[in-house]
Amino acid sequence: MSRKQFTLFDPVLLKPALWSAVLKLDPRAQWHNPVMMVVWCCCVLLTIVCGVQFAGDSSSEAVFSLGVTAWLWFTLLFANLAEALAEGRSKAQAASLKGLKKTVVAHKLAAAEHDAVSQPVPADSLRKGDYVLVSAGEVIPYDGEVIEGVASVDESAITGESAPVIRESGGDFSAVTGGTRVLSDWLVIGCTVNPGETFLDRMISMVEGAKRRKTPNEIALSILLVALTLVFLLAVVTLMPFSQYSVNSMGHGEPISVTVLVALLVCLIPTTIGGLLSAIGVAGMSRMLAANVIATSGRAVEAAGDIDVLLLDKTGTITLGNRQAAAFLPAPGISEQELASAAQLASLADETPEGRSIVVLAKQRFNLREHDIHALGATFVPFSAQTRMSGVNIHDRMIRKGSVDALRRHVASNQGHFPPEVEKQVEDVAKTGGTPLVVSEGACVLGVVALKDIVKGGIKERFAELRRMGIKTVMITGDNRLTAAAIAAEAGVDDFLAEATPEAKLALIRQYQAEGRLVAMTGDGTNDAPALAQADVAVAMNSGTQAAKEAGNMVDLDSNPTKLIEVVHIGKQMLMTRGSLTTFSLANDLAKYFAILPAAFITTYPQLGALNLMHLSSPQSAILSAVIFNALIIIGLIPLALRGVHYQPRSAKSLLRRNLFFYGLGGVVLPFIGIKVIDLFLTLMGWI
């Protein structure tokens, strides 16, 4: 990747983050986080108490209150810093995207043809539906679809990948993005957006969105944290009259002070996760962008972590995607050359890799030269997901090629007969994992073109990982059932959908969702748009059509369908990070009980000294040590919140057990050690 990656505490990010953390001390900024708002109120209260004490005669009590007050403000500041660092990384990424926007001159065409009259205009004046000519060395002014031409395009400014890509009319690689550069040849591009609606504009808006919407899980966790805060607030408030009653009843001791009560409240409420919760969500989206995936919202990232069904396109995801014509298998009474000639004619205007490979194979095997489709007076019939075949009409000749079922229906509709020998050829090709493409002329079946595809190395192991995580994998392919079954068995997927149409994909997604499952899928074509819109996590390819990108809730800048698996990992990592830090935060309270409660009541109930398990030097030292630890642990956990916990592909039960051991037990043990070390330091320095 050529895009700059920032370290956690990069000075470029740290300086503005520190200033932003100070600005976030404004109560209006704290209002969105109820837990930290309570801490802010406690800070203000203690600041007033501290001022009153210094104005009075209780100087020793005032010094103690000053120490507690200062560290409570630091607690708030550190929580703000975590969020500011996460937001700073997103803003830096947005700034890098803004740097890609260039003011360029576009060559606007009067018509969608290379030879049409052109005039130079500012790119900002272009509108949806306009056509432009972009030649070698020029920057593509706007997002659009390639209407004519084939060119090598440098997309490193967008994707970070230095290797150029081919963009061409027809097929799934016709979309181009404004800000990228044409390296060779030329392209006629039809603009698909208006000013302010370009891919870069939308990405910048998503990345630096001023107000990030909370995700459902985040809202649920926030409600839990608020409930816990209210419970602890009520419990602490009751300690004041209880303390007064105890002093009067026992005849000795001192009532608990406001400073101690506030310190106890802040240490008991879930400030750790409360301070880091927003940062975890922002960092999740930032990690997606680091993986070259733009998420439209944190909701999409979170949904990726809950996914339990993955719909994966066979071509490009499970297989290498470069299916090539390998053999011509003629029907009885048809020569191989006749089949090759017809297949070549049907493929002359076919811009897909498969279509071009048929033309090349016919030329290699029989020296059949390409024809000019216009000179032949031919009419090309394009492929569609509904008909699942393409071809050409030349005078009274009607040549078609396509899937077995589509050609069987086509031949039958022309009162033709589908030979059993061809059925056998189809089965033989499919059983070996190849794709049979049937060719016909009129009502006569000419034979089969065998296409070969290769399963990607290591993909079977990745599917095994997903299975251990409880995720079901489903391969989506337009191939017949025999071919699909052979490739599915080789790749190790759990299920497959053969002869897939847009309607079939949409129905399958709805079926899984009706069972209460969350579904993820990738897509790049306009025909994928309905299914992408229905899926819970929909990753559209950057090289795909505008309709696909608008229907999805994520865009993969690398246009790599396999990235869906990485998206799921990042989503699960975000959920695990949130759960782990919540467990750690709640487990922290145990040590703070043993530090603060005995210290608060020891003058009234000396017997509580037995609960001083850490042998803290004095009540004031115990309370201040707990407050300092409560603040420092937020700083200590910022790297974990921003990077995410280490995720391993395991079952939910295994992950829960590991989570409870490391973050539950760790959350109990670490505060005992930390508070004791801070107490020793304070005593050694003579500050208590």
Curated annotation (Swiss-Prot):
- Annotated residues that bind ATP are located at D350, E354, F383, S384, A385, Q386, T387, R388, M389, S390, K401
User: Where is it localised?
Assistant: Cell inner membrane
Q: Identify its membrane topology class.
A: Multi-pass membrane protein
User: Transmembrane stretches, by residue range?
Assistant: 35-55, 62-82, 219-239, 260-280, 594-614, 622-642, 668-688
Specify the domain of life of the species encoding this protein. Answer: Bacteria
GO CC term, one of those recorded: plasma membrane
Gene Ontology molecular function:
ATP binding; ATP hydrolysis activity; magnesium ion binding; P-type potassium transmembrane transporter activity
Keywords noted in UniProt: ATP-binding, Cell inner membrane, Cell membrane, Ion transport, Magnesium, Membrane, Metal-binding, Nucleotide-binding, Phosphoprotein, Potassium, Potassium transport, Translocase, Transmembrane, Transmembrane helix, Transport
Q: What is its EC number?
A: 7.2.2.6
State the reactions this protein catalyses: K(+)(out) + ATP + H2O = K(+)(in) + ADP + phosphate + H(+)
Cited PROSITE patterns: ATPASE_E1_E2
Q: Which residues form the active site?
A: D313 (4-aspartylphosphate intermediate)
Q: Which residues bind Mg(2+)?
A: D524, D528
Q: What does this protein do?
A: Part of the high-affinity ATP-driven potassium transport (or Kdp) system, which catalyzes the hydrolysis of ATP coupled with the electrogenic transport of potassium into the cytoplasm. This subunit is responsible for energy coupling to the transport system and for the release of the potassium ions to the cytoplasm.
Q: How does it assemble?
A: The system is composed of three essential subunits: KdpA, KdpB and KdpC.
User: PANTHER family, alphabetically?
Assistant: POTASSIUM-TRANSPORTING ATPASE ATP-BINDING SUBUNIT
Task: Kindly give the NCBIfam families that the UniProt entry links to this protein.
Answer: ATPase_P-type, kdpB
Name the family: Belongs to the cation transport ATPase (P-type) (TC 3.A.3) family. Type IA subfamily.
| Name of this protein | Potassium-transporting ATPase ATP-binding subunit
